């Protein structure tokens, strides 16, 4: 998968290209990340990349010409196959369904805003989609872009050692993940659930599924609005609720 990033701070993306799962994906040729800095497309000796907004008000906007030229350079490198995404608080909120959609793309160009944002006409003429990672304000689009890259890269075949790792992640099936345990068997008086030590794979599967459903019910009940539970899941949820009520 190829990703182009328009950013005033390309050095930040070493966190993606040099470390962890995404770093290994880059090293193994499964993921390619290229950056374009609008400062490299300026024509003044100060490398100016911000400009005053029409109508006044606080803050500055990213200057149109360097930003637009950087986007055009990324498009030229990617070809017609690239989808241009602007990371914006006004965009569609990123969730696992959205990540799955984006992971089907061969090429993505991510535009990272700074200051008060970008000229609306850039969005109208150069951007295909706007995406947001949440209802809060950040200093720029770099962290959202890295979040998107990391989440999408996990779904690229071969990036994770086992595809089951992605399939069992929180939200992969619309549910939160179940609890996980490793050694030692007892920690500060708390034991690993006996079922996980039983060796009975079917019982372990059912326990994990029930815990996943129950955790979603307790912590993120709104997620059930978009889920159609199977008969098995409905039964496990009813059992979980009954056991929770008894222990309350």
From Swiss-Prot:
Keyword ATP-binding on entry: no
InterPro entries named among the record's database cross-references: Alpha/beta_knot_MTases, tRNA_m1G_MeTrfase_C_sf, tRNA_m1G_MeTrfase_TrmD, tRNA_m1G_MTases_N, tRNA_MeTrfase_TRMD/TRM10
Organism: Shewanella frigidimarina (strain NCIMB 400)
Catalytic activity: guanosine(37) in tRNA + S-adenosyl-L-methionine = N(1)-methylguanosine(37) in tRNA + S-adenosyl-L-homocysteine + H(+)
UniProt protein name: tRNA (guanine-N(1)-)-methyltransferase
Cross-referenced NCBIfam families: PRK00026.1, trmD
Record's function text: Specifically methylates guanosine-37 in various tRNAs.
Subcellular location: Cytoplasm
Amino-acid positions noted as binding S-adenosyl-L-methionine in the UniProt annotation, renumbered to this chain: 113, 133-138
Domain of life the protein comes from: Bacteria
UniProt cross-references to HAMAP family, sorted A to Z: TrmD
E.C. number: 2.1.1.228
GO function term, MF aspect, one: tRNA (guanine(37)-N1)-methyltransferase activity
One annotated Gene Ontology cellular component of this protein: cytosol
Subunit structure: Homodimer.
CDD domains per the UniProt record, alphabetical: TrmD-like
GO annotation terms (biological process): tRNA N1-guanine methylation
Family membership noted in the UniProt record: Belongs to the RNA methyltransferase TrmD family.
Pfam family, one: tRNA_m1G_MT
Keywords, sorted A to Z: Cytoplasm, Methyltransferase, S-adenosyl-L-methionine, Transferase, tRNA processing
Gene that this polypeptide is encoded by: trmD
Keyword S-adenosyl-L-methionine: yes
């Amino acid at each position: 998968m190829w990703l182009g990033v328009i950013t005033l701070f390309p050095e930040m993306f070493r966190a993606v290209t040099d470390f962890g799962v995404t770093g290994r994906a880059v090293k193994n040729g499964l993921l390619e990340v290229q950056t374009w800095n609008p400062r490299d497309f300026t024509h003044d000796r100060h490398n100016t990349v911000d400009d005053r907004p029409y109508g006044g008000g606080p803050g500055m906007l990213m200057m149109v010409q360097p930003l637009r030229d950087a986007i055009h350079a990324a498009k030229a490198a990617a070809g017609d196959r690239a989808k241009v995404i602007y990371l914006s608080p006004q965009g569609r909120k990123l969730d696992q369904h959205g990540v799955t959609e984006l992971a089907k793309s061969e090429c993505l160009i991510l535009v990272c805003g700074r200051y008060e944002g970008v000229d609306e006409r850039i969005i109208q003429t150069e951007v295909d989609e706007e995406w947001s990672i949440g209802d809060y304000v950040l200093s720029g689009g770099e962290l959202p872009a890295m979040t998107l890259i990391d989440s999408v890269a996990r779904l690229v075949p071969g990036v994770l050692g086992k595809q089951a790792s992605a399939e069992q992640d929180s939200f992969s099936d619309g549910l939160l993940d179940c609890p996980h345990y490793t050694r030692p068997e007892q920690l500060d008086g708390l034991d690993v659930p006996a079922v996980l030590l039983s060796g009975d794979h079917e019982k372990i599967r059912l326990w994990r599924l029930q815990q996943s459903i129950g955790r979603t019910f307790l912590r993120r009940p709104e997620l059930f609005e978009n889920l159609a539970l199977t008969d098995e899941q409905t039964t496990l949820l009813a059992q979980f609720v009954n056991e929770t009520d008894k222990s309350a």
